[in-house]
Amino acid sequence: MSVKFLLGRAGSGKTSYIIDSITEQLKAAPDGDPIIFLVPEQATFQMEQAILRRSDISGFSRLHILSFQRLSQKVLEEQGGIAKADLSDTGKEMIIKNILLQRKDDLEILEKVAVKSGFSEKLSRLISEARMYEITPEMLEQISQELDLIHLKQKLQEISQVFTDYETFLQHQGYHHQEDRLSKAGQKMEGNNISFLAGSTCYIDGFSGFTPQELKLLEGLLTKCSNIELALTLPPQFTGKIDDELHLFHPTLKTYNQVWELAVNNDIEIKKSKHFPNENEEHRSASSLPRFKDNPALAHLEKEWGKNKINPYDSEPTGLSIVEGTNLRNEIDKIAREIKLLVRDHGMRYKDIAVIVRELESYEPVIKAVFNDYKIPHFLDRKEPVHHHPLVEFLRSSVETVISNWDYEPLFRMLKTGLLPISSEEIFQVENYVLAHGISGKDWKKQGKWNFIANFDLERENIAPSNRNKQYLSEINSIKGKVRDTLLEFDSKLRGINKSESLSAQFKNQEAEEDNLLSVREISTYLWELIEQLQIEYQLEEWSLEAEERKDFVEMQLHNQLWDTVIDLLDQMVTFLGEQKVTLSEYLQIIESGLANIKLGLLPATLDQVLVGTADRSRYHEIKVLFMAGVSDGLYPAKIDDDGIIDDRERITLRQHDVEFAPTTEQKLYQEQYLIYNVLTQPSQKLYLSYPAADSEGRTMSPSTIISDIQEMFPELFQEYQNDGPENDEDFRQYIIDGKKAVSNLIKLINKVGHPEKLAEDKQQLLAYLINEHPDLFYSTPEIKALDYKKSLSPLTQEVIDKLYPNKIATSVSGLESFCQCPFRHFAEQNLRLKEREYFRLEPASLGLFYHAGLKLFWDKLQENNLTWHKLKTEEREALVSEIVEVLSERLKNRILLASERYKYFKKKLHELLSRAVEVLSWYSDDKGFYPVGSEIGFGKDEPLSTLELELPSFPNKKVQLKGRIDRIDTGKKDGDLYLRVIDYKGKSKNLELRDLYYGLDLQLAAYMTVAMRNSDKLTGDQMFPGGMLYFGVENPVVPTDKPVSPAQARDKLKSTLKMRGYLIDDEEVLDLMTREDENSQDLLPYKLRTSSPGFYKNSKVLSEQEFLAVLNYTESKLVELAERVLSGEIAPYPYKDGGYSACTYCPYLAVCQFDLNYKEHKFWNVPAKGDYLSLILEEMEEVKE
């Protein structure tokens, strides 16, 4: 028995020596004594390939390439000890989660975090760590008795309790830890003959250190193998040096001493170490290491790295680059271009190239996107997490759906997995319905059909749904039936509900979930039955085949492996916890802890691909080119968080009591230097270091000290800066990856310099060459197509216009106002009929429906009971309002006002609002003055009043027909003449500005007055004259005062606040008829009489009869103008802007039209701030007459 150390720095030839030795032995004696090649788990495949690549080795039987786990497996297979399977990490975490749930009332220090997501994983890691370092629960308990630190003392006791429960559980089940396999294999090797090790030669490579369990197994190898040769990255002259944690080679020096001590303790012969290279370390030449024989610069880097005093390289280095990217994507784009050039121009294979990052989380999506864009085959060397996979989400959300009683969020998470027999279109359709109508779990479970529809006519009861709504409800209920039929039995089983129970009894039992305990076996069985019912296995197979057809081998392997993994997970739950009685919430926590721990190891799809890995995991052999990306501060060296259950100070305390866990963060930081050295020295020909100046969110990032250290070592090294695309004075050849990339980068450069003529001469020549010699390629690239893209919409074709409006435009005044605000908004609203998703909540539109319907019903009640508005007593008015509010609460949005305490509060506020509105409107109603003749009077087809139909001179064969509803029409008599007042309700106080009317932004009141005057015969039978058109703000304001006021003063202030706004006839007698107040009506209306002389103040909103009629005629002409613009097909975004407000401010279609002032096609039309618009209207109407 002997051991020999193979010592040398990185790249000195240790691994090549081992492979050469093995291949020579295999050639000399293919059936000779066993050869063991022990390497880290992730390096076994590479070592197999390295040996098989030798031209004269096509296979072997005597060679065993093993990791410690595989070695222990072989030992236990031969000697016994694996009758039961090892406990997997997933099983371990579920067991620990269950123990924490059972012990949650016994824990104090760990109580707050015991049920939190992720804590069971941390505790699982700690227990694994304890097992690897041969720490038992009893040791933790004993040390806790010796400590004076109360917090640590109690923490150790609680950890010991959980640890003991875990150990006891496994003993009863007959399982053992994965971590124990190494220790058990080491014990089996003591005193037993291991046949496959008899007479064997063992080579060990790729390790910088060993855990106590690995050392135990290594000790067994020392006593069983004939010869062991252990390779360590350690300069021979350091083997006798003082143990200094700060030294670069401290990790391997510590390992050397540990193995030496094992050999001495077991009387193993320690042969003279073999040094690499075979000359004195201090006198070797810069390029004497085999790996760097062709690159003196990389040899110099290896030699000088880690020294306190660096010897600068005296010339410009080759094969070494530093690049700063403006951002992470530009950094990876530069790497991708370099890889393509290396393969295309320098004869590299993709497998000769590796990309190393410190952590994959931020880089993975960018690397995938950019490498796929450049068509670079690559393999991510990591365990693939599966928490976003549809099957994993299905397992979580199916149980959560039952727990939450079919709550929206988990239910639709489950539906959107694609594993239920419901199409995506059906899911989106029913989701919109559920969100709009506030569908709850009990609504899903009831057998009856859903019949909620959007009711925009709250005044009438039991309105029959239209044919369109009937079809819609039929589709919705069909989808509801599919969901219900699929899940109801599963739900009943988990709740322990008998199918023969009445529906009311079932609902009564649904609230008893916490008391309804089922065994883990029962719940898992029901879950499995649902999986089988849905034929999920076949769906995964179908997805796998589809992925294979797309050549997405990563997704293909995910689907294939995950099915078996999930089956194994459920098996373990039943095996370990089968008879354990749990609530559904506890079961969910247990299965979630298991699912969170699933990570799948995927195989490379091909051998010739770029390996993308992390510095601490990935192992490389014979890599020629290495791209070290993300060399930023905080990543190299890594920030090692002290976030474990036992922190660094506590670990140091435990070490003082002879209990040593894994290294502290400080020790890991020391080891980080060795890790960096190991990465930097991997490539034999080229090393690229890069870092981004900003992260993905634009935050500034600083380069790592590695960059400054290398710049100090290589003062002649030129640092590159990678911007977003090429520069005009830059060598463009590196951007000519292929034709499309050449065009793409040329376009970027043209955009940057402003014009093709400003390109440098070589770029102009390339541009001309591509256009003349490869026009198809040039003009087919997306960037060139984008140059022709105009961010404007062409007018609709006449064919489309005729289909939309065959004979007429049937619309509303507000529809044409919408067109005036922005033609695209009108197109999206009226033609495309785009709508925002509706939610079950109170919105301005719903509130508008409420108070319009409330005021209409109040008027109807007055009519039914032969009451007059102004003669109602307060208590009578309040009784009517209360009755109306109760009626509307039942009708508004599926009884939303009764849905919760919050909405019941809104109901109260709406009651106050309606009550105030009715009170204020009574001030304007007097049967001796102006009094309503109708409320919410419709005009249009099948309405009391005729359609407002206007001729369109530019389109003789078409007309515009306007429909709508007038909130209130009042009339009053003066000297036998009937005057008309039109009132429109708004959610808040609003002015009518002639400027807005002139430009077509506010035509509603004037159009309504025109409709009323044209329909005078139907309203009163008499001719009517204009009296006023007013907006009434339905609001209940709080009026501020600077001192206490009397009720009369408060009433006066309220009048001023709630006055109607608009335009009135300039007749004082008519205006006095407008209110029933004893005092002058000007407190309630928008006018003010002069006191010193007859007439109105300048700011009074009054018009003469001639002016009134001119305004109404102008309104008609404006409506015609807008209708003709609609018929011309105008749909391009052209929003109005008024000061700081524009049509885009609250527009829901902004994301659709993509209005952007950076494009010349896009601009606002501005509404002038001031002007005498009455004069303009009068002038234009005078011109029309002429």
UniProtKB/Swiss-Prot annotation:
Heterodimer of AddA and AddB. One of its GO terms (biological process) is double-strand break repair via homologous recombination. This is ATP-dependent helicase/deoxyribonuclease subunit B. Keywords: 4Fe-4S, ATP-binding, DNA damage, DNA repair, DNA-binding, Exonuclease, Helicase, Hydrolase, Iron, Iron-sulfur, Metal-binding, Nuclease, Nucleotide-binding. The heterodimer acts as both an ATP-dependent DNA helicase and an ATP-dependent, dual-direction single-stranded exonuclease. Recognizes the chi site generating a DNA molecule suitable for the initiation of homologous recombination. The AddB subunit has 5' -> 3' nuclease activity but not helicase activity. Residues 288-620 form the UvrD-like helicase C-terminal domain. PANTHER family: RECBCD ENZYME SUBUNIT RECC (PTHR30591:SF1). Despite having conserved helicase domains, this subunit does not have helicase activity. Belongs to the helicase family. AddB/RexB type 1 subfamily. One of its GO terms (molecular function) is helicase activity. Binds 1 [4Fe-4S] cluster. It comes from Natranaerobius thermophilus (strain ATCC BAA-1301 / DSM 18059 / JW/NM-WN-LF). The lineage of its organism: Bacteria, Bacillati, Bacillota, Clostridia, Natranaerobiales. SUPFAM superfamilies: P-loop containing nucleoside triphosphate hydrolases (SSF52540). Pfam families: ADDB_N (PF21445), PDDEXK_1 (PF12705). The gene is addB. Its EC number is 3.1.-.-.
